[in-house]
Amino acid sequence: MERAEKREFVTELNEVFKASGSVVVAHYAGATVAQMNDFRSKMRAAGGTVKVAKNRLAKIALQGTEAEGMSNLFKGQTLIAYSTDPITAPKVVMDFAKTNDKIIVLGGAMGTTTLNADAVKSLATLPSLDELRAKLLGMIQTPATRIAGVVAAPASQLARVFAAYAKKDEAA
């Protein structure tokens, strides 16, 4: 990589660190090209991105961002997974790490908070923003459904009572 390319890459990575909802740093030593391509495609499908960067360039790109505290994670062969949704990147990385022992999560960042590996794992267990919205909508709709059921119940019970009397009269 030439000096101009490095500057451009650092600038691009700096913008990524500033705009991302969450960033996950992991070791990928020993992972095959096929495994990395599979990982990248899964991350892309979920709305995130995976990049491999030189540690020195990543540390330079971190300067002046909220995630500057995670610069100590960049040792060895590291990859950077990020997404605008705070849950997507940790969830995809942890799901992929379950089936692939070559991906070892080191930590990450979410806003100004630097995360260790355990924090990334717990973040991955949280529901996504869309799932939370669906649950909230379900909770809002439930009382209305119950009220409609209670209001409709006496009328249906009355109809059953009249039907039972009608059958009783016919039988008699």
Curated annotation (Swiss-Prot):
The keyword Lyase does not apply. Keywords: Ribonucleoprotein, Ribosomal protein, RNA-binding, rRNA-binding. One of its GO terms (molecular function) is large ribosomal subunit rRNA binding. The keyword Protein biosynthesis does not apply. SUPFAM superfamilies: Ribosomal protein L10-like. GO terms for biological process: translation. Pfam families: Ribosomal_L10. GO terms for cellular component: ribonucleoprotein complex; ribosome. Belongs to the universal ribosomal protein uL10 family. Part of the ribosomal stalk of the 50S ribosomal subunit. The N-terminus interacts with L11 and the large rRNA to form the base of the stalk. The C-terminus forms an elongated spine to which L12 dimers bind in a sequential fashion forming a multimeric L10(L12)X complex. NCBIfam families: PRK00099.1-1. Forms part of the ribosomal stalk, playing a central role in the interaction of the ribosome with GTP-bound translation factors. This is Large ribosomal subunit protein uL10. It comes from Rhizobium johnstonii (strain DSM 114642 / LMG 32736 / 3841) (Rhizobium leguminosarum bv. viciae).
